[in-house]
C-alpha cells in the first residue's frame, strides 16, 4: 500500500490511486525512471499529456502525493467533482486566465505540496506535442515564477496504447520518467525563454527514455485516432 505515511488528508487520494493501480497493473507494464527518489514538496511536476489514463499512471509511479490541475469540465457530475476534490485535484478553466486555480496552486505549494501540471494544454501527440517540438502554455512559468518553486520535467510514454481494448490483453509498456529540477524563472527573466528551456528538457528526457528503455515504434506516442485506426 503506497502512501500510508502521508496523513489523513491524503487517504482518499491514496485509496483511489491504489484502486486504479490495481485495475491498470494487470493490463499494462509500468516502468519507472527516477520517480521513487524525488524529495518532498514544494515543487512543480510538468509532464506531457498523452491520454486520460495519465494521471493515475503518473500518481502510481510516485511515493508522494501529487495535487494535479485538471480542466473544470471534468468535475461534473457533482459526485465526481466531490471525488476529484477529495483527491486534492485543482479545477482550472481553459478559456481564460484562472486566477482562482492559480491562487489555490500557490497555496498548495506554500504548504509544501507537489503540484502536477500538463503544460501542453490538453492531450497532445505528434506535431502538437512538446515531445515533437510544439511550445508549452504559459501557465507553468507563471506558477513557477510566482511561487519560486523548482519545476521537474517528466515524460509519460505508452499510455495512449490503452485506448485500444485488445492492447490490454498483451500488457503494453508504459514508462514514467522524471528529470532534474529546473529553477523557477528569475524576476525580470524572459518567461518564453524559460519555457523553451523546459520544453527542451522534456524532449531530452524523452530521448533518454527511448534509448534507455529501447522503446519499440508501437510504444511511441500516437493520437487516440491513430491508435483506433491501426488497432494497436
Question: Where are each of the predicted segments found?
Answer:
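A transmembrane-helix-recognition feature enriched in membrane-embedded lipid enzymes
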Residues: 1-37, 57, 78-87
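Non-catalytic C-terminal accessory region of glycerolipid acyltransferases
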Residues: 3-12, 100-232
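A generic secondary-structure micro-motif detector
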Residues: 9, 31, 69-70, 94-95, ...
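Short, basic, glycine/proline-bearing loop/turn elements
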Residues: 19-20, 86-92, 122-127
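A structural micro-motif
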Residues: 28-30, 64-66, 87, 113, ...
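A secondary-structure boundary/capping signal
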Residues: 34, 70-71, 88, 118-119, ...
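Catalytic core of membrane glycerolipid acyltransferases/transacylases, capturing the structured
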Residues: 37-96
Amino acid at each position: 500500500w503506497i502512501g500510508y505515511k502521508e496523513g489523513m488528508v491524503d487517504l482518499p487520494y491514496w485509496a483511489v490511486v491504489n484502486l486504479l493501480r490495481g485495475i491498470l497493473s494487470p493490463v499494462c507494464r509500468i516502468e519507472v525512471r527516477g520517480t521513487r527518489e524525488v524529495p518532498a514538496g514544494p515543487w512543480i511536476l510538468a509532464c506531457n499529456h498523452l491520454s486520460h489514463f495519465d494521471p493515475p499512471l503518473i500518481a502510481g509511479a510516485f511515493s508522494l502525493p501529487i495535487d494535479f490541475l485538471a480542466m473544470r469540465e471534468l468535475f461534473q457530475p457533482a459526485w465526481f467533482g466531490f471525488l476529484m476534490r477529495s483527491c486534492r485535484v485543482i479545477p482550472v478553466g481553459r478559456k481564460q486566465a484562472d486566477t482562482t486555480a492559480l491562487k489555490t496552486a500557490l497555496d498548495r505549494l506554500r504548504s509544501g505540496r507537489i503540484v502536477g501540471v500538463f503544460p501542453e494544454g490538453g492531450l497532445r501527440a505528434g506535431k502538437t506535442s512538446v515531445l515533437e517540438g510544439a511550445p508549452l502554455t504559459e501557465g507553468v512559468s507563471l506558477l513557477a515564477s510566482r511561487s519560486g518553486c523548482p519545476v521537474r520535467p517528466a515524460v509519460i510514454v505508452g499510455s495512449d496504447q490503452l485506448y485500444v481494448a485488445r492492447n490490454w490483453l498483451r500488457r503494453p509498456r508504459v514508462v514514467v520518467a522524471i528529470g532534474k529540477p529546473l529553477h523557477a524563472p528569475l524576476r525580470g527573466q524572459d518567461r518564453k525563454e524559460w519555457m523553451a528551456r523546459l520544453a527542451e528538457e522534456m524532449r531530452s528526457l524523452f530521448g533518454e527514455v527511448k534509448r534507455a528503455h529501447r522503446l519499440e515504434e508501437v510504444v511511441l506516442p500516437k493520437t487516440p485516432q491513430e491508435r483506433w485506426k491501426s488497432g494497436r
